Amino acid sequence: MTIKLNELIQKSKNLVFFTGAGISTNSGIPDFRGPQGIWKNSTPIYFQDFISSNDKRVESWERKFSNELSIDSAVPNTGHIKIAEIMKKKEESHLITQNVDNLHQNSGIQEKQITELHGNATYASCLDCNKRYELIDLKQDFLITKNPPSCNRCNGIIKTATISFGQAMPEAEMQLSQKKAIQSDLFICVGTSLAVFPAADLPVLAKETDAKLVICLLYTSDAADERLR
């Protein structure tokens, strides 16, 4: 960490971190849009296809249980741990993440300090009644039957607790993230391409409301570069 950034963090009273897939690559989880990203070699399954097609649900669960994203064995890296150390000293700080790997929680950050914009891939839930399911139980049944799981309470469709392409963003989480961005005096982006909307609007919102903006990443989209100038 540079001396300048450390000074900004020390002086900040409303620090917000905004993280994307790039922070987790050193934990063995590939990002999505980088040169070796997931979507270079795999096509995403859209939400409407998932709910309307049994075959697509089977494909989705096969991908999940093949550990495509290496989430099960991943542990927090130095980036996660450093952020956790900073946030432990700053109780008013907040973290907004696009990641679904649960590594920020595993690094020691309190749940109340984290907003997950794209959900969490370490468990599943019913799309109708929201009943939570642990993946280990679903995996055992799926490997035997090859049928996509359905809710034992309401017979609804079960899906990993993530936001898929074409699925509506969680309203409460978006509103809280926008509020935190507006209130921030220092907004630090780590490992995000700033290419996924509406989340990519958050650093712009922070900048427009006079927060100092810091971007720590290997690459951004051209559109993001232009909007943040």
Where are these regions (language model features)?
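Single conserved hydrophobic/aromatic residue that forms the stacking wall/gate
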Residues: 219-229
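Conserved catalytic core of sirtuin-type NAD+-dependent deacylases
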Residues: 1-221
